[in-house]
Amino acid sequence: MCFTPDALPPRIPEDRVIPALAGGAAAERLTLESADGTSFVVALAECPDPVGGPAVIILPDVRGLYSFYVDLAERFVTAGYHALAIDYFGRTAGAEERDDEFDYMPHVMQTTPAQVQADIAAARDALAERTGATSFVTLGFCFGGAQSDLAGTNPDLGLDAVIAFYGMLSPERAGLDSPDFPAPLRSADKIVTPVLALYGGADPLIPPEDIQAFEAALTSNGVPHEIYSYPGAPHSFFDRSFDEHADASADAWRRVLDFLGKVEAGAVA
């Protein structure tokens, strides 16, 4: 898995928290319906006074929706953004809440990018209806980071950008060779939206040569992108319990919030 069940997202740097929103807003658990009729659960954190930038659709790691991502959605509210975290496994595990013993991998291996993108579309529509948002980005972690990258290949989703934290680029690095497992490096030439990608420099699952090849493909296709690797940081460094990586996490928050501002201004280079 990416994070332990008791992991917590790092706090947003204090100077990026909007004082009037510092108390945040509790996320609401909703059930949405995907295009194929699947019911799936999301956690919606609605900002009472948004800054006007894109709404954030959060794509979790291999465990699907759990407390880390609910908390993360609530964090975005304090910076002025609506955020909604989705669960992937409505088709195979139902919409009930799950405990820490949930055996997620059989469900991961049955989850296709097409299904995830259908759920993203439903999440986008729910955000538009509930909040009035008109622009959207995906933000994913690990498995969700790879799904976020691939969402950037689908112009029908109407995304303004995609963001990935240590999204695995070549799943064979982890011995995952399923044709349905997301492999952004093989699809990089099809990405059409701006990309922000953040990696741990000590992550054996995403070696420098994969990152370089991914960036080269984006550059070749003229896709605006920002890619950064944190020296010495592991996979899943974005965790409040990793004191030794607190600076990397704070910098990652700043890069994400700066990127959202650029997306709003149409200024991603």
Model-identified regions with their sequence ranges:
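N-terminal cap/leader regions of alpha/beta-hydrolase-fold enzymes
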Residues: 1-269
